[in-house]
């Protein structure tokens, strides 16, 4: 559930004095519906209060007083929690407001439904008013208006706050720019500048959210608007402090991670400051959700893995890192589709070059942090593990083949701990795979990224685990047949471990 206690919406805009009554009435009715939907969602509103500009027929040309009067009518339905942030000035209170309107503000203050912020009378400019509103708001909805709306939107974009413009043709009180209509057109061109996390998804809905030619009733349209803002806030909250970084190297591994972690195949990635693609996910647990970031190295190799892991650690500062994917296994020890979790990683490339062209192995060995080792031991000892993994495999649609020409196949999803030999070689020689056991007699899995990930995490004090599905035996039978199966199996174990194995500090 999205925490909305500190979220505030600015409904920015105005109406031209020449706008038809039909559209003026629709705009104010929509703002009243929005006010209710926003308050229902435990979200607040930001307003600027001064006079009440009207056209020759007495129709109000701004929305702030509409919001306040609706809030006064509704406030008995809510627990007072300063849901309104009112920006005004002493001179505006004194010279531009009626006594009746001043009493409305007092009523909201006494009920603890509003906080009032007073601008210095000598500093009242459109820019300063806008800055004060934007400082208080975490989202903006735009209707009509001109340069003032555009200026507020520019400030909101710099703060990475969502902006939802509507297409109702209202003009603006100053007739000095395109306002919400310009923002609406901009949304189609650059959706992520308007909703930084969910912009592409919102863009796909924008045509159905027309206020000029409404498909939905105004109440439902206001509810959808708030739902979109809440989805964006939720996505941004996930990014602030993700619990776990989930890493892959190859496209087949990334596809498996997205499938198991519930990321739609057509969901557009976000970009880090270094241009690395990533997706947000959440794993539900009894002690609260685990927030995660899924990313990929986009190629194999420990050097690349170390560099990208370091960049992602610096950007997201996760509590834990899991790398998942495929690996080669020793035929005598492993079966196809089996999943292993690293208990240690050996970097087999390190050596001394001796006289006569001889090499003396000097392997680097990295082991699990003690808390991680304890978590893994407890996880593997759980009696319900096998049944739970079977249920997960069935739910995701993973079926192990009965047999394979390449060798023995796992009867189902099985997992154990193992020692990984990591280097820069794509293994197609079983004798070489066997020789890794001379470095450590428990080394029975070979791959190309684990040491890079472990080393990067070790340097920053972040615990890491490697989860690998066995896709081949590192010999002449090696092909791509088990890549997808082994990747999905590894992803299932990764998700299950995060839900049931990792004990948060």
From Swiss-Prot:
GO MF term list: adenosylhomocysteine nucleosidase activity; methylthioadenosine nucleosidase activity
BP-aspect Gene Ontology terms: defense response to virus; L-methionine salvage from S-adenosylmethionine; nucleoside metabolic process
Pfam families per UniProt: Cap17-like_N, PNP_UDP_1
Cited SUPFAM superfamilies: Purine and uridine phosphorylases
Reactions this protein catalyses: ATP + H2O = D-ribose 5-triphosphate + adenine; dATP + H2O = 2-deoxyribose 5-triphosphate + adenine
CDD domains tied to this protein: MTAN
Signal sequence region: none
Location of the region described as Purine nucleoside phosphorylase domain in the Swiss-Prot/TrEMBL record: 239-505
Keyword annotations of the record: Antiviral defense, Hydrolase
Any one cellular-component term (Gene Ontology): cytosol
InterPro entries per the UniProt record, alphabetical: Cap17-like_N (IPR041327), Nucleoside_phosphorylase_d (IPR000845), Nucleoside_phosphorylase_sf (IPR035994)
Function: Effector protein with (d)ATP degrading activity of a CBASS antivirus system. CBASS (cyclic oligonucleotide-based antiphage signaling system) provides immunity against bacteriophage. A CD-NTase protein synthesizes cyclic nucleotides in response to infection; these serve as specific second messenger signals. The signals activate a diverse range of effectors, leading to bacterial cell death and thus abortive phage infection. A type III CBASS system.
Family: Belongs to the Cap17 family.
Name of this chain's protein: ATP nucleosidase Cap17
Taxonomic source organism: Escherichia coli (strain KTE188)
């Amino acid at each position: 559930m999205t925490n909305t206690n500190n979220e505030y919406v600015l409904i920015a805009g105005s109406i031209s004095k020449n706008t038809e009554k039909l559209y003026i009435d629709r705009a104010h009715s929509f703002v009243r519906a929005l006010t209710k939907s926003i308050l229902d969602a435990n979200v607040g509103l930001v307003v600027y209060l001064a006079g009440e500009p009207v056209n020759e027929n007495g129709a109000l040309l701004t929305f702030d007083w509409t919001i306040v009067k609706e809030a006064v009518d509704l406030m008995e339905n809510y627990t007072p929690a300063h849901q309104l942030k009112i920006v005004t000035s002493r001179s505006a209170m004194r010279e531009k407001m009626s006594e009746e309107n001043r009493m409305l503000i007092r009523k909201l203050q006494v009920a603890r439904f509003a906080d009032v912020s007073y601008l210095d009378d000598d500093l009242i400019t459109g820019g300063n008013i806008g800055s004060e509103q934007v400082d208080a708001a975490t989202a903006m909805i735009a209707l009509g208006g001109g340069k003032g709306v555009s200026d507020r939107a520019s400030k909101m974009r710099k703060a990475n706050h969502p902006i939802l413009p509507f297409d109702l043709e209202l003009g603006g009180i100053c007739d000095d720019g395109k306002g919400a209509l310009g923002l609406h057109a901009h949304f189609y061109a650059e959706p992520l500048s308007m909703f930084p996390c969910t912009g592409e998804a919102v863009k796909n809905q924008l045509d159905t959210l027309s206020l000029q030619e409404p498909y939905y009733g105004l109440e439902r349209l206001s509810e959808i608007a708030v739902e979109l803002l809440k989805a964006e806030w939720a996505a941004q909250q996930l990014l602030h402090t993700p619990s776990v970084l989930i890493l892959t190297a190859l496209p087949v591994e990334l596809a498996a991670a997205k499938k198991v972690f519930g990321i739609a195949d057509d969901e557009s990635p976000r970009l880090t400051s270094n241009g690395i693609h990533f997706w947000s996910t959440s794993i539900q647990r009894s002690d609260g959700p685990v927030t995660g970031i899924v990313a990929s190295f986009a190629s194999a190799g420990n050097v690349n893995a170390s560099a990208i892991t370091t960049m992602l650690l610096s950007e997201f500062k996760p509590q834990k890192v899991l790398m998942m994917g495929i690996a080669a296994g020793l035929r005598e020890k492993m079966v196809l589709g089996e999943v292993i979790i690293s208990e240690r990683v050996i970097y087999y490339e390190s050596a001394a070059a001796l006289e006569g062209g001889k090499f003396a192995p000097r392997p680097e060995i990295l082991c699990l942090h003690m808390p991680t080792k304890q978590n893994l031991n407890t996880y593997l000892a759980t009696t319900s593990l096998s049944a739970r993994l079977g249920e997960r495999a069935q739910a995701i649609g993973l079926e192990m083949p009965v047999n394979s020409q390449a060798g023995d196949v796992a009867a189902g999803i099985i997992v154990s701990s193992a020692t990984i030999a990591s280097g820069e070689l794509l293994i197609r020689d079983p004798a070489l795979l066997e020789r890794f056991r001379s470095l450590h007699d428990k080394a029975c899995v070979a791959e190309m990224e684990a040491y890079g990930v472990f080393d990067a995490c070790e340097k920053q004090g972040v615990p890491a685990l490697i989860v690998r599905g066995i896709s081949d035996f590192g010999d002449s039978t090696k092909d791509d047949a088990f890549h997808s199966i082994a990747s999905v199996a590894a992803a299932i174990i990764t998700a299950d471990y995060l839900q049931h194995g990792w004990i948060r500090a």
